[in-house]
Amino acid sequence: MKKIKIALIGNVHDHALANFGVLKSHPEVFDVVGVCNLVPGKDESSYANEKTFNMQQLLDMDELDAVLIESGKENEVYDAQKFAAAGKALFIDKPGSSNCDEYDKLLDIVQNKQLPFALGYVYRFNPMVQKALEMQKNGELGTVYSVEAQMSVRHDMQKRRWLMRYKGGMTFFLGCHLIDVACTFLGFPNKVLPLGFSSGHDGLTSCDVGGALLMYDHAQAYLRTSAIEVNGYARRQIVINGTAGTVEIQPVEYHIKNVKCEDNMLAVAKITLQKDNPPQWDEGGKTQESQPFARYTPMLMQFAAQIRGEEGYVRPLEYERKLMRTIVAACGADNEVFIPENV
């Protein structure tokens, strides 16, 4: 199997090191040629032995197959446009852009050149989310009429101050994962109601409690994400309600203690089906635990399969276009969420 020659562009995104680690851990799949545009002092030792290039050198490198773009939400779409124009396969960390129009331009290039393209939405590969989606497709849940999801954490003041650079703050930062889940199950909404606000904690004005209500003719999705929630990580939850069954995923993912291999996470779901005649006023669900899984590896392996021509896009490009518009609307914006004066 021919190795995929790939380069890392930027290291700003929170998942940059983890995704880069996957590339380095699988030399049978990826040949990391080097790095570009790294922020000095950020995880410096992890990239110390990598060859450094400037952008033009990589754009001119005929043998380069792909790039992993981790240059930050307001920058990544512009970097991606350049490499797409050069015909390189693209893995971009979520959500792919802070500007809808620029994102559309990128996807136009990807579509015209038929380039491999992937985004870092981790829940797309979560085994219990995938199970719920399979159950929906099989009709086991009946008609899905509601998705409720929470994805919270306790961030320090520096991170919460950083949120000020984006309209919608946490809705943009982590809420994009939840919006992706909701739109996967329900399609795209007729109306989006932004629900994010600033708690004012520590005197900051950033939108540190994000949220949105996605409204449909006969369904809705309520999504919430907080940067100040005590024990927020452990309370992350996705609930899919259908007329014939409910899937409650909690925890959505948690680390298996003392396991150092890639497959070091588990997800748990409680599944309740009407056909099993569950009691009306008592517990009737059956709890299932996933097999151990890796958070980042499946995304990059699917990307590699795209490059080899073995698989297609995880989601259609038209879905990705509409998803970006929905995320930006949930942030209370029309086209752009980046606020440069707040940097």
Question: What feature does the model see in each segment?
Answer:
Residues 86-88, 113-115, 218-219:
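A short helix->loop->beta-strand "cap" motif at the edges of active sites that frequently abuts
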